[in-house]
Regions:
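Extra-cytoplasmic beta-strand recognition segments
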Residues: 1-10, 36-43, 75-76, 88-90, ...
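Extracellular beta-strand ligand-recognition surfaces/modules
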Residues: 9-12, 37-72, 76, 203-207, ...
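Extracellular glycan-recognition surfaces and repeat-rich motifs
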Residues: 92-126, 163-166, 170
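Extracellular carbohydrate-recognition regions
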Residues: 70-107, 272
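Secretory/extracellular carbohydrate-interaction modules
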Residues: 121-186, 256
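Beta-strand-rich interaction surfaces with strong enrichment in secreted/lumenal proteins
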Residues: 24-30, 128-135, 190-196, 241, ...
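Extracellular ligand-binding interfaces
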Residues: 1-47, 67, 155-188, 217-224
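Trp-centered recognition loops
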Residues: 30-39, 71, 85, 138-140, ...
Length: 272
């Protein structure tokens, strides 16, 4: 706060685009002639979409209403680990041009990506992928609710570092699931038997902790998605990558070889 500025308190804030609700951090009284550092831990809340963040200055009593306020801002950034859920019934189709449409919160590499009846659909001729999140997420768990519809290469991705680097959990042919590594092309790290069926709902949980990956997949019986009281068999995959592991990255969804999958939600949380 410059010496010539009026008295003011200051706080950081974020705004949810969907509800319009504003969350603010602790208010700090500004000292004239001094740089001060503020921090704000954004709370976890379901279904929110942060579309704005910034600084709020509250002028104090005694400051003339007509006085021009001056405050200096050196840096403003957001970082940290994820703690939120994407429910696709709340996402929207963004129309960029008449022919160019994208799904909110996602970056599409390739494939037919669209929303239908509250779910995200991804299909392809050769391959399709879409990503969300930050490149610098480190240790986290991502839980995907997905339904394979056609084909034998329906996948979810973690530690995504772009189109040529990521890990994936895949529903494959011959009643198998596998953990894959994308090194400008996918290869199988480990696999196991799992009698998955097209048209059924599955919960895929992937924990990335350092160089170790732990994945679980189980069928979600009809009517049990909200209660999570599941009695279905669970398949487990574990692998520690000692060959140039990917230690950070976003999350995503992907299909290959003409496959088509739909996704109901993605839940991300840090492993602290």
């Amino acid at each position: 706060l410059p010496e010539y500025a009026g008295e003011a308190d200051c706080s950081l804030y974020v705004r949810d685009l969907r509800s319009g609700k504003i969350f603010t951090g602790k208010s700090v009284h500004l000292k004239k002639g001094c740089w001060q550092e503020l921090s704000f831990r954004i709370p976890s809340w379901e279904g929110a979409l942060i579309g704005e963040m910034g600084v709020c200055f509250d002028l104090l009593m005694g400051t003339e209403a007509t006085q021009t306020f001056a405050g200096l801002l050196d840096d403003l950034w957001a970082d940290g680990t994820p703690d939120y859920r994407i429910d696709f019934c709340q996402e929207t189709t963004e129309v960029w041009t008449g022919l160019h449409k994208e799904v909110s919160q996602f970056t599409r590499l390739k494939g037919h990506l669209y929303l239908d009846q509250g779910a995200l659909h991804l299909s392809c001729a050769d391959f399709g992928e879409a990503y969300t999140g930050r490149y610098d997420w480190k240790d986290y768990t991502a839980v995907f609710e997905m339904t394979p519809l056609t084909g034998e290469n329906n996948m979810v991705n973690v530690r995504v570092q772009g189109a040529i680097r990521s890990y994936a959990v895949a529903l494959l042919a011959d009643s198998k699931i596998a953990l894959l590594k994308n090194e400008n092309g996918y290869r199988v790290l480990t696999d196991t038997a799992f009698d998955w069926k097209a048209g059924r709902d599955y919960e895929v949980s992937v924990c990335a902790q350092g160089a170790r990956l732990h994945a679980e997949i189980k069928e979600v019986p009809v009517g049990c998605r909200q209660t999570q009281q599941l009695q279905a068999d669970t398949a487990v995959l574990e692998y520690e990558d000692t060959d140039h592991p990917y230690l950070q990255g976003a999350v995503g969804v992907s299909v290959r070889n003409g496959s088509h999958a739909k996704y109901s939600s993605i839940r991300m949380r840090c492993n602290s």
